[in-house]
Amino acid sequence: MGNLVLIADDDRDIVRFVALNLRLEGFDVVVANDGQDALDMALDVGPSLILLDTMMPRMDGYEVCSRLRDQRPDAQIPVIMLTARSMEADRSMAYTAGADDWVTKPFDPAVLVSKVKDHLRDQGTAS
């Protein structure tokens, strides 16, 4: 379970693209297509890392991250926000909600995979 990544994004093309690149690097992937499902899966499955879109139906990524941190304060699950937003205020909101990192769309998949590996290595869960 040390390589399980939850991808939470309502854009199915982004999900397929990210999932493919992570699987090619040996990661297992689970997917949520809205914020509520993302929170439920994060709490139920306990992924090693979460890639979280900021703008999703039912609950935005900031709220998902904040609720996850509130409901599981002991869980040290790294959260990387994926977003089309590039304003500093948005980045600040992400970090305030408890995010560990930020990637702006469009992104280089090699950079994203590298960030995933770095955060898992920092957590001691990368294989």
Question: What residue spans do the PLM features occupy?
Answer:
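Active-site beta3 strand of CheY-like receiver
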Residues: 45-51
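Receiver (REC) domain active-site loop signature in two-component systems and cognate sites
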Residues: 56
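Short hydrophobic/Thr-rich beta-strand motif most characteristic of the beta2 strand and flanking loop
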Residues: 26-33, 41
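C-terminal output helix
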Residues: 107-116
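Charged docking surfaces used in two-component/phosphorelay signaling
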Residues: 16-24
